[in-house]
Amino acid sequence: MSELNITSSQIQGDVTVTILHLSGHPHGNTENQLLDRARQAYEDGSKYLLLDLSELEILTSAGLRAIHKIFNMFTPQSDVEIIHQHSTEPYKSPYFKLVCPSPEIYYVLNIAGFLQNILIYNNMEDAVNSFNGD
């Protein structure tokens, strides 16, 4: 079982987007590593986060749990209230998105219900350009 490696970068589009590039295998022992990196980006003022899944080998329940916690971290309280008020309407986060999952990881995200709230892109350019600060 390989470890999870995380590198970080920022790209300036319409807004500054922090990208966490993941490679390897997120599991119970590395879940906090991913959460800590996302939390550090958030505390450093990042409002927009993109997870690059292109080098991720597998997505376990620990990885899904981490993605869910990061979604909550980057979703403002005002949006949470909108989600609860309009629970029958899908909410797509403008603050947290995913890019380049393998077909297997996309399938896991789909059956876990993550596609209802998190936008997923097939290439980095489209993903970065989707953040617009509205």
Regions found by a protein language model. Give the residues of each.
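Short acidic DE-rich linear segments
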Residues: N132-D134
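Short beta-strand/loop segment at the start of cytosolic alpha/beta domains
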Residues: M1-H21, P26
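Amphipathic alpha-helical interaction surfaces in cytosolic regulatory modules
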Residues: G28-N117
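Short acidic-hydrophobic, aromatic-tinged amphipathic segments that line or gate anion-handling sites
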Residues: I118-M124
